[in-house]
A protein has these predicted regions:
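A periodicity- and composition-biased signal for non-globular, repetitive helical segments
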Residues: 8-10, 63
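Sequence context surrounding c-type heme c attachment/ligation sites in exported
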Residues: 18-141
Length: 141
């Protein structure tokens, strides 16, 4: 009899100590809208990827996209970033990018293109460092 009571007690103990699984509702993911500058930077990256391929093929088929000048006015994710250093770096990038479309030889194209990539990296080393590894992939070797 004592044994049956002992077994019954163990059963009650084990069944009452069961962890109840409470299902938590997953919070919906909130997509953050990209800033105007972020969208422009992504477009610049894609454009420069195509330029890289054109340089490898030996001929540049594009013109400078004038809307890249919006780098000076596009709304930033963090508005405090637009300081004098940012303005200077943005202009250096634009100058290097425009120089691409004024050269004659493939070697000059490569040099000016890599200068434009270098201008991107120098700015991104100070501001918004996240994309630096991605930008480095743009170099023409």
């Amino acid at each position: 009899m004592k044994f049956k009571i002992f077994i019954l007690g163990l059963l009650i103990c084990f069944t009452s100590c069961k962890d109840e699984v409470v299902k938590k509702e997953k919070e919906p993911l909130i997509m953050v809208e990209q800033s105007e500058m972020s969208l422009l930077m992504n477009e610049m990256f894609a454009f420069n990827e195509s330029i890289k391929q054109q340089i490898k093929d030996g001929k540049l088929n594009n013109d400078f996209p004038e809307h890249f000048n919006k780098i000076h006015t596009a709304v930033l994710t963090d508005s405090t970033v637009r300081d004098e250093a940012f303005k200077k770096d943005a202009q250096l990038f634009l100058d290097a990018q425009k120089a691409l479309f004024e050269v004659e030889t493939t070697e000059d194209l490569k040099m000016h293109y890599n200068n434009a990539v270098k201008a991107c990296i120098s700015c991104h080393e100070v501001t918004c460092v996240g994309p630096v590894p991605r930008i480095k992939k743009l170099y023409v070797k």
